[in-house]
Every structure is written in C-alpha cells, then in structure tokens.
C-alpha cells in the first residue's frame, strides 16, 4: 500500500525519496534489513540474546572487548589466546578440587580451546624425556596429579602479566556472528564458567543463543563484510 502510494514520489519531487526495508528475503521490492554487528553495544546484544540477569552483562562486555583482539590481523592474537586459556586452566589447576575433576575440566577446556603452543598435545620437555601435556595429567594410585607443579609452571609461561584489555586502544573492525561467538566462548572461560554450576547455568545460555542465531537464517540481518562507521550507515539508510 505504501509502496503504491509513495514509490514514485521522486518523480513528483526530486528532493523526496522512498525506500523500504524488510526482513522477508522473498520480498524483491525492498532492501533486506542489515545491521552491522559492531554497531551494537552491550544493551543491544542483551536484548538480542534475551538476557535475564545482570550477571550476564559483564560476559557480553568481555566478549565485545575480546572480539577486536581475536579477529583481524593483530600479530599477537595467539599470545592473547594463550593468555586467556592459560588463566582459565590455571584457575582449574589451583581450585583445590579432586584430582579427577581437575583433570577432566582441564581436558575439557583444552579440547575446545587450544593453540599450537598450548594444547593437550603440547610438548613439555624435561631433561631426558618429553611428554605431552595430557600425559602429565596422570593421576597416581593415591589420587594425586603426579606432575601438578610441572603442569602449573608450564601453564604460567603463557600468562602475560602486562596484558590488560582496558589499556588497549579501541579498534574499529568488521566482524561476524561467528567471530563474536568465538569471543563469547573465550569470555566465558575467562569468567570462570567451569568453576561454578551456578555461573555455568546463566553464562552458557548466552553462548547457546548466540550459536543458534549464527546458524539460523536470521544471520543475514547481521552479515557485513566490510567495516562501516555508524555515521556512514545512518547516511545510507
């Protein structure tokens, strides 16, 4: 109805234009609504992911801080990933839980989050022999991790004491839902998702919802390949 009435308004007045946006991909007469993901802030993503508790907001904030580090051409990406993974693993190793729980949680983290330097297959070298990280998680007959000190010292080598997200200059880059999903996962482990069942329950749901969105047809509304500023985006509307 509006298209019929206003579609040719520029023929009547060249200073006036008519444009429509739609979320229906089958509508060939309108532009598909597209919102660059990096223009969304914490509150926007909270609405998008149906946040239900204030405790979930810091996780979104952390994900937004990490996505610019983990995406793009930063030469230190691997160092940052190693630091985040190492801190999460170290928290587990020093948690005081039973050895079997510590081992299982460390294996779970390093199965999902790893780099070529920090993984279950990473080589730990000692005089006379070399073992993988996973082999060093052996539990003896008394129920203790035999190489706890060795593993802890190895993990500590990846922690950057001078790494502070707040000190990094803000980067403006394009990123996708998949990129944000990766950043969200790293934010979850950095927030200690495995240390508490309560934290896991309210935190993991964010990852689940973001994953569902990234793999649904609705991802097209957030797909953008090139960076565009907020002002430019608004000018093009």
Predicted regions and their residues:
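P-loop NTPase motor domains
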Residues: 2-11, 25, 33-237
